[in-house]
Amino acid sequence: MNEPQLLIETWGQPGEIIDGVPMLESHDGKDLGLKPGLYIEGIFMQAEVVNRNKRLYPKRILEKAVKDYINEQVLTKQALGELNHPPRANVDPMQAAIIIEDMWWKGNDVYGRARVIEGDHGPGDKLAANIRAGWIPGVSSRGLGSLTDTNEGYRIVNEGFKLTVGVDAVWGPSAPDAWVTPKEITESQTAEADTSADDAYMALAEAMKKAL
């Protein structure tokens, strides 16, 4: 059996167009009642697909890893992520830029929502500024696991994989369809703001006017 190693996966390509349209997650009211703030939401991970790092996560293995991560980190409000993905297994809270609030499955895709951490002049403020300027971040996961080679040009993640960081916000992302939708929730809104960069900027401008 191979020794466990740090597996960093960059899931998706920011701004990727599939069949002529951006791969944006459709929102169905799940987000009603969110606290005011800036969020990123979309596909965090994918099972049963060869990603850009030439690795495949069997669904049964990723399901267990995600379930454990939700129970151990998301539900206990420990699920932090950073801006970019440093080469270590765990998050440095001093460098945290986001906190994951929810994760769920749709088919073979793991969706999630993370709140951008703002107000301390730290990495989250920089991430928020980039998003409000129109940047679309990608997402990257970190975990510990071993790999098995195949004869088809990719490697399979073995049983025992442990997800240690559900998502970091990164530039230039690895699952074919995984990138995220920024959205702004203001004091006067219970539904999400429009996900286009222009409309997100307008929502922010309106919120600033109301605060004056």
Swiss-Prot record:
PTM info: The self-cleavage of the N-terminus allows the activation of the protease. Probably also self-cleaved at the C-terminus in order to detach the protease from the scaffold protein and allow it to diffuse within the prohead to cleave the prohead proteins. After cleavage of the inner core of the prohead, the gp21 protease also destroys itself into small cleavage products.
Keyword Transmembrane: no
Enzyme Commission numbers on file: 3.4.21.-
Positions of the UniProt region annotated as Homomultimerization: 117-136
Site residues, Cleavage: 9-10, 206-207
Function summary: Serine protease ot the inner core, which is activated by autocatalytic cleavage after completion of prohead assembly and processes many prohead proteins. These cleaved peptides from the inner core and the auto-cleaved protease escape from the capsid, thus liberating space for the phage DNA genome. Cleaves the prohead proteins after the sequence motif L/I-X-E.
Assembly behavior: Homopentamer.
Family named by the database record: Belongs to the peptidase U9 family.
Protein name in UniProt: Prohead core protein protease
